[in-house]
Amino acid sequence: MCRLLVVRSQEPFDPSEHLAKFALIAKNSREYQGHGWGCAWRHGRTWQGYRNICPIWEDDHTRFPRTSLLVAHARSAFEDKDIAVENNMPFSDGERVFIFNGELRGVKIREEGRIGAEKIFNFIRRFDHGDTLGALKKAVEIIRNQTRSIRAMNIIMVKERGVYLSTYFTGDEDYFTMHYKDGPELMICSEIYPSDQGWQSIPNETVRAW
């Protein structure tokens, strides 16, 4: 399953430092994370994005400008299917940016989207009329009730400077537990940065905002 990263800072930072650490996490993951990657960053009041079908550890991380908000995703495609750059996250509608990892089978909701993650993003958007956290809670509850089997469903959605997270998994706690480190820089990642201190684990079934 995929790897997720969000970094939000009070001051602009060089994203290459975070992307290098994230690339190392993806490369060393016990599950292959090389089906492409992407990132989005805040530029003024708008989102800019980049996606590439190559593994993140083979790409150039120095191409991106300084920013105060970064969202990144390294993809491990479900059953090695639908490997195409347009299926790489982050997904964005210009207002929200979305990343996901997990595995769901027998989902009974109807929504537009090329792959399951995009359908989940569009389903959450359906309920977001200003209360993004409330929309995330409602959508996750419905999806859980309308899905035959969920191995994991970790979601991060960023809107303006708000970061909204939902985490749920039914096994493999070490792999699916999300982690965060708060301070002048907020960092949320699928794994703790190598040789870094001060991270906290996010409990399963958390839905919260920063």
Named regions from a protein language model:
Residues 1-54, 165-171, 186, 201-209:
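Extreme N-terminus nucleophile/cap motif
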Residues 2, 39, 87-104, 142-209:
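Conserved catalytic micro-motifs used in adenylation/nucleotidyl-transfer and phosphoryl/amide-
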Residues 33-37, 65, 84, 149-151:
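Short, basic and Ser/Thr-rich N-terminal targeting/leader segments
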Residues 38, 70-73:
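A short, Trp-centered hydrophobic/proline-enriched beta-strand micro-motif
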Residues 50-62, 72-94:
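Short acidic (Asp/Glu) patches
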Residues 105-163:
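Short histidine
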